[in-house]
Amino acid sequence: MSELFWFEKYRPRSFDEVVDLEEVKARLRQFVKAGNMPHLLFYGPPGTGKTTMALVLARELYGEYWRENTLELNASDERGINVIRERVKEFARTAPVGKAPFKLVILDEADNMTSDAQQALRRIMEIYAQNTRFILLANYVSGIIEPIQSRTVMIRFSPLPKEAVFARLRYIAENEGVKVSDDALEAIYEFTQGDMRRAINALQIAATVSKAVTEEVVAKALGMVSPRLLRETLYEAVKGSFGKAATQIYGFVADGGVGELEIIKQIHREMLRLDVQEYVKPEIAYIIAEAHYAILRGAHGLTQIYGALAKVRRLLKSV
């Protein structure tokens, strides 16, 4: 197996290689066909393809000259708006290489910038609009000031569907000589929730443990509880022997080395899948959320987990 991070090794280089995101690809292809584009704002959760799509767009626009015509910046890494201004100024003052009518600046984590810094960024975008286009990347559109939102075409990126993640993971596993079971893919998706970057990283970590990646291997590698085993334990806790379930949960922590925070997160997801009346699920979610918050505040993790499960058990017996 290559030592290179698989997420970078298998990052798509063209629109055709990008899984899912059909509507986004269709819009960006129109810009490539026209040879022109507005400023863009890509927003959505981490690992949903924002950076990848920005780089693919650069490749499609500029071909072999995409590196010369593209400047990548990270708002968190740069030392303030003045550094960004100077780097953009230096980049924009030279003509695009090849036949491109403009250069491209990709600014990641733009929502981490202060409002004042974003106001300065807005002015930079206006000053260099004649020969430079910006693609801003953000996890939360609410973190971007309205004057920038109104000057960009906003494109939303959603968590990737399970089928798209599975297809990509199977492709990578086959290329790396790794066997991965369907249960392992389910466990990875459970852990990463549609974040492709985390899913690929999770597969690579699991593959360092064994070239035959199973659900158990994934759980061990990622420091989580096997989803199947957790479901059985939760069923025992709410409908069977509570003492037996408590012993199993203690084992997850003491023997398996799984953190209480990870367990409560997994419990939250699994509890909402219980076969119970829909009106009860918000109450269950609130009980688990209270325990989660208490653990974050420093309360004893196992005590909070046991208490939450006992409350859910009583609730389900009362309905």
From Swiss-Prot:
Q: Which residues form a coiled coil?
A: none
- Residue stretches spanning the membrane: none
InterPro entries, from UniProt? AAA+_ATPase, ATPase_AAA_core, DNA_pol3_clamp-load_cplx_C, DNA_Rep/Repair_Clamp_Loader, P-loop_NTPase, Rep_factor-C_ssu_arc, Rep_factorC_C, RFC_lid
Please give one Pfam family short name.
Answer: Rep_fac_C
Q: Carries keyword Nucleotide-binding?
A: yes
Which GO BP terms sit in this record?
A: DNA repair; DNA-templated DNA replication
Per the record, GO CC terms?
Answer: DNA replication factor C complex
Please give the Gene3D superfamilies that the UniProt record associates with this protein.
1.10.8.60, 1.20.272.10, P-loop containing nucleotide triphosphate hydrolases (3.40.50.300)
Instruction: Report residues binding ATP.
Output: 44-51
> What would be an example GO MF term here?
ATP hydrolysis activity
Keywords recorded for this protein, A-Z = ATP-binding, DNA replication, Nucleotide-binding
Spell out the family assignment given in the record's similarity comment: Belongs to the activator 1 small subunits family. RfcS subfamily.
Q: How does it assemble?
A: Heteromultimer composed of small subunits (RfcS) and large subunits (RfcL).
NCBIfam families assigned to the protein according to its UniProt record, in alphabetical order: PRK00440.1
Give the protein's function: Part of the RFC clamp loader complex which loads the PCNA sliding clamp onto DNA.
Q: In its UniProt entry, what is this protein called? A: Replication factor C small subunit 2
The species is: Pyrobaculum aerophilum (strain ATCC 51768 / DSM 7523 / JCM 9630 / CIP 104966 / NBRC 100827 / IM2)
- Give the gene name: rfcS2
